[in-house]
């Protein structure tokens, strides 16, 4: 049996909730390069939607602010929002991951004619229940 040693030891964390942010920070503080992937436009996940959370019954901003500052200050963490994993290949220790990143802006060539709105469906998922 041959052990595979990856030459690129970048860690991909999928999900930018509190757990994902914490996992990314812990790995980065151990010296690893980390890519934190979130499908939504911002980090925080369900906790960001809460009024207060257990055990201290504090507002989500108090706990999230600390993690967001740590992420911002850590050069080993790269955050990709509005991104989804489309394919994974490889084997343990050596994966290739394809990521689709959604656009964040309207191009300058847009004339606001309304054709784009007609071309796409207007059904939206229930964003509070993730589906």
Which residues does each PLM region occupy?
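Cysteine-centered iron-sulfur cluster-binding motifs in ferredoxin-type domains/subunits
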Residues: 13, 20-22, 28, 58, ...
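Phosphate-coordination loops involved in phosphoryl transfer and adenosine-cofactor binding
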Residues: 8-10, 82, 107
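N-terminal glycine-rich dinucleotide-binding loop that anchors FAD/FMN and/or NAD(P) in oxidoreductases
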Residues: 48-85, 99, 129-131
């Amino acid at each position: 049996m041959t052990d595979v040693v990856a030459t690129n030891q970048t860690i991909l964390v999928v999900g930018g909730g509190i757990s994902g942010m914490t996992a990314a920070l812990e790995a980065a503080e151990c010296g690893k390069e980390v890519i934190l992937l979130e499908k939504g436009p911002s980090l925080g996940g369900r906790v960001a939607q809460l009024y207060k959370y257990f055990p201290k019954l504090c507002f989500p901003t108090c706990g999230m602010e600390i993690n967001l500052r740590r992420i911002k200050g850590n050069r080993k963490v790269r955050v990709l929002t509005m991104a989804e994993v489309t394919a994974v290949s490889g084997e343990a220790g050596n994966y290739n991951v394809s990521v689709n990143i959604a656009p964040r802006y309207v191009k300058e060539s847009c004339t606001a004619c309304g054709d784009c709105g007609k071309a796409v469906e207007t059904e939206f998922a229930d964003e509070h229940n993730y589906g």
